[in-house]
Amino acid sequence: MKNNRITAIISLLLLTTSCVQKTYRKTVVFILQTNPIQSIEKVGIRGNDKPLNWDADLSMKTVVKDSLYKATVTFITGYKFTEVKFVVNDRIELQDKNNRKINFTATDTTIYNAKFDSTNP
């Protein structure tokens, strides 16, 4: 009976003490250059981590029409990076290429500058 009680206590302790990954609140300011594309109707961003996803665009705000767009996204994540792709007029960039990997800075906010469909900023 004593062994059963000890086994039960140990099992209970193992079940209630789990490894929980530390989460971080990280904000990324995405700045996207779209020139020379003309007649832009909508610009968005898709990605791995909430609030982004790969099925729908998060809209980016126009800074300069047909040229410069911006979005600020806050992630609550256990990772130190995220992956994204930009979308212009329903066209996803970097087809058949890796996603953009954004490494979060040590501070709370990361500024990420990009040029649409180019791996060179």
Where do the protein language model's features map onto the residues?
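Hydrophobic helical h-region of N-terminal Sec-dependent signal peptides
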Residues: 9-13
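Bacterial signal peptide processing site
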Residues: 20-22
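A short, amphipathic beta-strand motif
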Residues: 26-34
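Exposed beta-strand face motif in extracellular beta-rich ectodomains
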Residues: 80-84
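Extracellular beta-sheet/turn segments enriched in Thr/Pro/Gly and aliphatic residues
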Residues: 101-121
